Amino acid sequence: MDYKNDINSDDDFDCSNGYSDSYGSNGRMSNPNGLSKAELRKTNKPIMEKRRRARINHCLNELKSLILEAMKKDPARHTKLEKADILEMTVKHLQSVQRQQLNMAIQSDPSVVQKFKTGFVECAEEVNRYVSQMDGIDTGVRQRLSAHLNQCANSLEQIGSMSNFSNGYRGGLFPATAVTAAPTPLFPSLPQDLNNNSRTESSAPAIQMGGLQLIPSRLPSGEFALIMPNTGSAAPPPGPFAWPGSAAGVAAGTASAALASIANPTHLNDYTQSFRMSAFSKPVNTSVPANLPENLIHTLPGQTQLPVKNSTSPPLSPISSISSHCEESRAASPTVDVMSKHSFAGVFSTPPPTSAETSFNTSGSLNLSAGSHDSSGCSRPLAHLQQQQVSSTSGIAKRDREAEAESSDCSLDEPSSKKFLAGAIEKSSSAWRPW
């Protein structure tokens, strides 16, 4: 866009169209009256100043729209911005873009910072040498310039410490003539200038905040920041050395053994481990060996062998697990063996009812006297096999039917056994169950 030939480029200025008639194609005012160059320049000065202000305002409006879009701000809320605000926002945005580019360059190539710092130090030394050789320069200007260069060099050192790319980065970065990572400044020490611009990192004391040591400093953009020193690579202090035969070594060995015993609790005895057994763990049947062959578990004629289910899954509830454990211990005792010979409970191969069933059964015990029925014709199985108990009405009815079929073969008195089975089924069906 040609700002020189466009008078009405900005709405803020009321430029009349009368001025455009006296201008030629090249944008300069013609001389119809034969005025001199001085008079013509004096006549053209207000018009050129108005054009210059129009160009500035037009560029500021363009810059305002661009910076609001870049900073993701609503233009409707920032309709009236001063020229200084627009310029400040532009400077901050360009500084942030520059920092982002520097970070990207550092991530892609860590040696970029080293190269930049080396070149900056060389240029700063050349400027300092040139200023010191020139005559007629004020001492205050020379001091402020040297202090500013020192501050910039220290800012570059802070960037190198924050990048944290190599271990020996701060030690061997500059040549022998340049500044090093030591507290010595880039140039010889100079007194404080009038504007106090020589505030560097070495002069700033460390502060404690929240248990952390922070160093106040300034970023290259001029912003104030608190930097945490790099202590991540520091190794922990070694512990005190103790000879193996000394008392300290024995105490250290005892302490390590105690810690190992706490961390690895495999040395617990059987008494302690018995209390750690969960209620959901399945008890081990001690009446039958675990490695008993199948050919040794035989049954007598007229006796049906029930299938054995080796399952590692937990029982349905802790109550059934505890009750089955108690029933196994009762079945393994000799008193229960003697009682099973003189009762109808030894005739049936199904396991006894659970504790919940017996508690709600109003008929009492099912054991009869030895004179009412003789079960000598049917002997109990060789091994008591554990079965998982299912507390449901259908499972109880199924066990009653199986018991009725088996008792028909083993019973000596057929009518009495059927009568007993009918009574047991009637009592079990009439019993109230919570489920």
From Swiss-Prot:
Pfam annotation, one family: HLH
Placement of sequence motif WRPW motif: 432-435
Gene Ontology CC: cytosol; nucleus
Region Disordered, annotated ranges: 18-48, 305-334, 349-416
Function: Transcriptional repressor of genes that require a bHLH protein for their transcription. In the larval brain, required to maintain the self-renewal and identity of type II neuroblasts by regulating the expression of the transcriptional repressor erm together with other self-renewal transcriptional repressors such as klu and E(spl)mgamma-HLH. As part of its role in neuroblasts development, has been shown to be a direct target of the Notch signaling pathway, however might work also independently of N/Notch. In the developing larval and pupal brain, required for mushroom body differentiation.
Quaternary state and interactors: Homodimer. Heterodimer with E(spl)mgamma-HLH and E(spl). Transcription repression requires formation of a complex with the corepressor protein Groucho. Interacts (via bHLH motif) with sisA. Interacts with da.
Protein name: Protein deadpan
